[in-house]
Each structure stands twice: as structure tokens, then as C-alpha cells.
Amino acid sequence: MNMIVAADKNWGIGKDGQLLTHLSGDLKYLKERTLGKAVVMGRKTLESLPGGRPLPGRTNIVLPANPDYEKEGCVIVRSMDELREKCAEFPADGVMIIGGATLYNELMEECDSLFITKICEEFEADAFIKNADELPHYKVVWQSEQQEEHGIKYQFFEYKREK
């Protein structure tokens, strides 16, 4: 499994259930990296998507806190163990965690690749992920040129777990 996330300089990823900023280049990157794959998310992440609907062209796997939660067009799993079992049904590169912070932090070190958009600014955030640069078994294997949108600079990084 893998994960994709955008984080600011302090590894903040969200505030009040929303992204810190909307960068069309980052959203395009997310689409390119996830289309045709299984995307794993919590309920709040699902409900923050446009219209609160599953992402088209992907298998949407949702782990809600509420055991009675149902959502049309989604595969609902009830525990981390069930989530891991469901993810094992897909090729390793065919599963992408897309949020939120609880899932990222729980599963980050189980991921083969971390696709991280580093935003070169600090935002007021209330949701954070672990600092990928401090994870001992990961190294950067690719990084893009720096991008800029609406005066906000950012860069794409791919981290790989060393075997």
C-alpha cells in the first residue's frame, strides 16, 4: 500500500476538516496517482470530497468510526484488520491512502511509497502527519521541480521504504 498527501512545513495537512489550501496542480497529481486504484480513507475525508461522493474511477474503501455507517459506491470496512485484509486483495501499488490524519499516522510506516506534496509555507493546522524525513526506513527517490500557484510554492516528493 502507498499514501498520498499534501503537507506544509510543519507536516500539517488540514484545519477544521478541510485541506490547508487548494492547489490545482496538487489535485491533478492526486488524480494521476490514484485513478484506477483503490483509495483508502476515513469517513470525514469522504465527506470532504466534492458532494461527499466517492471518487470516480477508483475503488473507494472507507473506514468509519461509526460501525453502522454505510455509503453507496463505497466498500466499508469496520476495523484496521479488515482494512488490511481488503487492501491485500489489490496489487501493492494499487492501494493509496488519501486521508485523514488518523489513517495516515496509523498506516504510514506500512506503506511502500509515500507521495508527499510539500508546501513551502506554514498554515494554521489542527491535523498533522509524521515527519517523513525523520522516518528511518524511508528515503527520497524522486522530487519534482518546485511549482508555484497563487503565490504558494510546493514540490512533489516520492519516498520509498527501504527493504
Language model feature labels by segment:
Residues V5-A38, R43-R78, R84-K163:
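Flexible, gly/pro- and Lys/Arg-enriched active-site loops
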Residues M1-M3:
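Extreme N-terminal starter segment of soluble prokaryotic enzymes
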